[in-house]
Amino acid sequence: MAVFDKCAQAYQDKFMDVGMYEDTFDVFCAHISNHDAAILDIACGPGNITKYLLSKRPDFKILGIDLAVNMVALAQANNPTAEFRVMDGRAIVALEKKYEGIMCGFCLPYLSKEEAVQLISDAGKILSEGGVLYLSTMEDEYSKSGVKTASNGDELFVHYHEAGYLIEALHRQGFKIIDTQRKEYRGGDGWAVTDLEIIAIKHNNPDDLNTPA
């Protein structure tokens, strides 16, 4: 996570505005009716998503986690009413708590296929019945994953994911898909990028899970 610690401030300057995704975050919020709901923000970065969620639902009790110390420091400064800690998103079952919402906005591109599927499984274990899971990733053939070079020369391995195996993993864990969206834009070097957003509800009735992608 040295790359993210190094570029934390630059990342905040570039990505603090989450306007492109606000409509999907609104769907997430709309499906959490309980007041003071416990929300987990995985790979929270500088707290950009947490900040938006709290602007819509100041009652949310949000815990944000990130592996980068500098990201966590920025997130806490940006969201003094939320809680943040340095933690690996692949270890969320260690929290030993139930959440009514889990936000995974910018994590999956840094997880392998196997890790992404495991994260969905882990999320199912710590979500309450009726809890909401938000997933977002860059969508493409998984085989196209590889090392990407940032404008400052830093290199990072980026994973593309496919909707098919993510949705299959969600259904296996008792999730019902309630919203699927795709957003297209141009990446930093001009290449076309498709962001996939999936919102699902933890639903333990297997007869009620046959929702098309």
Where are these regions (language model features)?
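Short, glycine-/aromatic-enriched active-site segment of Class I SAM-dependent methyltransferases
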Residues: M138-F157
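Core SAM-dependent methyltransferase catalytic element
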Residues: R186-A213
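A short glycine-rich, Lys/Arg-flanked "PGG" loop and its adjoining helix->strand segment in the class I
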Residues: V117-E129
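Conserved class I S-adenosyl-L-methionine
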Residues: M1-S33, E141
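Class I SAM-dependent methyltransferase SAM/SAH-binding core
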Residues: L40-I42, P46-A91
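Conserved beta-strand signature within the Rossmann-like core of class I S-adenosyl-L-methionine
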Residues: G130-T137
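A conserved beta-strand element that flanks and buttresses the S-adenosyl-L-methionine
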Residues: M103-C104
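Short alpha-helix
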Residues: V158-Q173
